[in-house]
Amino acid sequence: MCIRDSIVSDVRKTGLAIILTEILNKCINNFEVSPSLYVHIKKMIISFEHHDFNPVFGIFFVKEILHFFGINPQNNYDEKSPFFNISNGRFESKKDDFLKTNFPHKEFHQLLGMNIDTIFDMKLSVDKRREILALLLEYLSYHEILNQKQIQSVHVLQSIYD
């Protein structure tokens, strides 16, 4: 397979790329970003082209850009702090009212620890991917980086995940 054609020739990758572009566009329009963000995005796109499709990449991509907007979640998950808190951006002892009771906190913790070299090996169920994506979009919205209601393509992303 030609590396340059993999995103355009794989409908799943194309759909995911369109959705991530929309999310990124909405975030960048609200903030002045550094050139290092573009370097990081380029690295992620190249890696996305080189690997087989994995729907977890979309969630990973959104997680990776958080740092560039100054809201990188703290990965302090443990037995005493098993619940992620959107407003504080860290795991805490009490459940956050923003999140569903069955939110996959442990899997979110695992995602936060992943890097571009390991993300393509991660597997998550459809429901867990949806919950984590919803959390990340809510997190961006809570911190006023993204108006989640403006994102039109999330339903398309969910159909790709199924």
Predicted ranges, named:
Residues 4-162:
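Non-catalytic alpha-helical scaffolds and adjoining flexible linkers that form interface surfaces
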